[in-house]
């Protein structure tokens, strides 16, 4: 058995590095508004919102091109991962939402049903015995059910 280490996801590490290279005086918003935390918004949209706020500020320093390239690649990677996860989830739901037909419709299934159907003393066909099989050797009459 291999012991696996739980490492943070790569896009999160890159986003932290990207945000760490920015100067506090650059005008980047220091905190996400409280209404954003309460909503169920994907991480890529939160990241895009923060970058759009930062780039819209007029008094910011010039953004190095490699930082913007890095941030855009992180954003694109996160978006692709979210789309893939959504597709996998849809396929999973579709696979298990379909009703399954019995695998044996005729032939062996009819023979097996006939073998398990018992007749009572008057010769009337009863229900399959495995549905009403008594436990501990006791006999159960059909009238009790």
From Swiss-Prot:
**Which positions carry Asparagine amide?**
136
Q: Report whether Secreted shows up as a keyword of the record.
A: yes
Q: Which residues form the propeptide?
A: 28-89, 92-117, 140-145
InterPro entries in the cross-refs? Neuromedin-U_amidation-site, NmS
State the superkingdom: Eukaryota
Q: What does the UniProt keyword field contain?
A: Amidation, Secreted, Signal
Q: Identify the GO cellular component terms for this protein.
A: extracellular region
Q: In which tissues is it expressed?
A: Expressed by the skin glands.
Q: Does the keyword Repeat apply?
A: no
Quick one: signal sequence residues? 1-27
Q: Where in the cell is it found?
A: Secreted
Give the protein family: Belongs to the NmU family.
Q: What else is known?
A: Isoform 6 encodes peptide NmS-33, at positions 92 to 124, as a result of splicing out of an exon that encodes a processing site which generates NmS-17. Similar 33-mers and 36-mers have been isolated from human and from mouse and rat, respectively, although they do not arise by alternative splicing.
This chain's protein is named Neuromedin-S
